Regions:
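N-terminal signal-anchor transmembrane alpha helix
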Residues: 1-22
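Membrane-embedded catalytic cores of phosphoryl/pyrophosphoryl-handling enzymes
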Residues: 12, 36-160
Length: 160
C-alpha cells in the first residue's frame, strides 16, 4: 500500500507541474495577445503535456520496487517492462493518434451541412515530456525512500 501512495504522489506532483507550466504559458500568451487555451482546475486532470504523469507514476513504481525488492528481482523486471510499455505507448502510439485526430478535426470543420459529432482530442507525449516524467517519478520515489517514515528499512541504506 505504501508504494501506491508514492505512485499517487508522483502522479499528483507531475499534474501540478503541468498546471504551473500551463499557467506560465497562458500568462505569456496573454501578454502576446494570442490566448488559445484557458487554465482551469480541470487542467489538473488533463492528459498529455510536460511532464508525463503516466511516466512519473510507473517510474516511481519501478524505483520503489527496485529499491525494496532488489534491481535483480523478477518483480522489478515486470515493473520495468510495464514502465517501458507505458512510455513507448505515450510516444509511439498516442502522439501519432494526436496528429491524426488534429487532421480529422480539420477535415470535419470543413464539411458543411453534415451532422458530424465532435471527437475528443487525444494528446500524446514528446521525448522531453517523457524524460520529465521519468525525472519526477524517480525523484519522488527517492525522496520517499530517503525521508519518509513509510520506508524505515530503506532509510538505513542511505546511511554511510
Amino acid at each position: 500500500m505504501r508504494i501506491i501512495l508514492v505512485c499517487i504522489c508522483a502522479w499528483f506532483v507531475a499534474q501540478v507541474i503541468k498546471v504551473i507550466l500551463n499557467t506560465i504559458r497562458f500568462i505569456i500568451d496573454k501578454k502576446k495577445g494570442n490566448v488559445t487555451k484557458k487554465v482551469t482546475i480541470g487542467t489538473l486532470f488533463k492528459l498529455g503535456g510536460m511532464p508525463s504523469s503516466h511516466t512519473a507514476t510507473v517510474i516511481s513504481l519501478s524505483t520503489c520496487i527496485g529499491a525494496l525488492e532488489g534491481f535483480n528481482s523478477n518483480i522489478f523486471a515486470v515493473s520495468g517492462v510495464f514502465a517501458f510499455i507505458t512510455m513507448f505507448d505515450a510516444f509511439m502510439v498516442r502522439l501519432p493518434v494526436e496528429k491524426l485526430t488534429e487532421a480529422f478535426i480539420g477535415v470535419r470543420e470543413k464539411v458543411e451541412g453534415k451532422d458530424v459529432k465532435p471527437i475528443k482530442k487525444v494528446e500524446g507525449h514528446t521525448i522531453p515530456e517523457i524524460i520529465g516524467g521519468f525525472i519526477v517519478g524517480a525523484g519522488i520515489a527517492l525522496l520517499f525512500l530517503k525521508f519518509s517514515p513509510l520506508f524505515p528499512e530503506y532509510v538505513s541504506l542511505f546511511a554511510a
